[in-house]
A protein has these predicted regions:
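Active-site microenvironment for binding and transforming phosphate-containing groups
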Residues: 1-213
Length: 213
């Protein structure tokens, strides 16, 4: 388990990042695979989710996961829908006590958000497709609908580095078409391709809300 210096100082919430280790899954899913949408054995996934629940000190029935689709959809869990079973979204928000919300990532960017004044938390799965289509903006906007007085604390978790994120011209053009200034997130290489800095692109989205992190 890994923790953020920014969030660990708050005693009324818990957070952490898990690595891929410490679970029961085998082969390509080795070992802490929590993806219910994967082709791993369901019993292994459920065992892994139980391990996670125990580690963070929450009942396994109160651990909410998403079926992530690289969308810009945000779901708020409240007293009216907290019995929901299958959540198709790429961000979760809640202010309900004693539940945990979670995000699964490999290369994509995990974002954890805490709104201190109203005790609202959120987690975001920001891949390139979700990011370019507004998953970050949608999450903050939806959080701000709960209350206008906001004090955000944001942590951007581990993700793919730009030196390992090689993309083609078509990918590059999608971002330039969206905004010419997006070219600063790309570095050309010798293969007529580009390296994309997903983390910095997501960071820019966050700072547009005047949030320092």
């Amino acid at each position: 388990m890994y923790f953020s210096k920014e969030l660990i100082k708050f005693t009324n919430i818990k957070h952490c990042f898990f690595s891929k280790n410490g679970g029961v899954s085998k082969n390509v899913y080795n070992s802490l695979n929590c993806g219910l949408g994967s082709k791993d054995k369901k019993e292994n996934i459920l065992n892994n989710l139980s391990i996670v629940s125990k580690k963070i000190g929450v009942d396994k029935n109160n651990l909410y996961t998403m079926i992530q689709t690289h969308s810009n959809k945000v779901v708020t869990i409240n007293k009216n829908n907290q019995n929901i079973k299958r959540i198709y979204s790429d961000a979760l928000i809640t202010n309900i006590r004693n539940i945990a919300i979670s995000v699964l990532t490999a290369d994509c960017v995990p974002i954890l958000i805490y709104e201190k004044i109203n005790n609202v938390i959120a987690c975001v799965h920001a891949g390139w497709r979700g990011a370019i289509n507004g998953i970050v903006e949608n999450t903050f906007n939806q959080m701000m609908q709960i209350n206008k007085n906001n004090s955000f604390y944001v942590v951007v978790g581990p993700c793919i580095s730009s030196k390992n994120y090689e993309v083609g011209k078509e990918f590059y053009n999608q971002f330039i078409y969206k905004n010419k200034k997006n070219e600063k997130f790309f570095t050309s290489n010798k293969n007529n391709k580009f390296y994309f800095n997903l983390r910095e692109y997501v960071n820019l989205k966050i700072t547009k809300f005047d949030i320092k992190f």
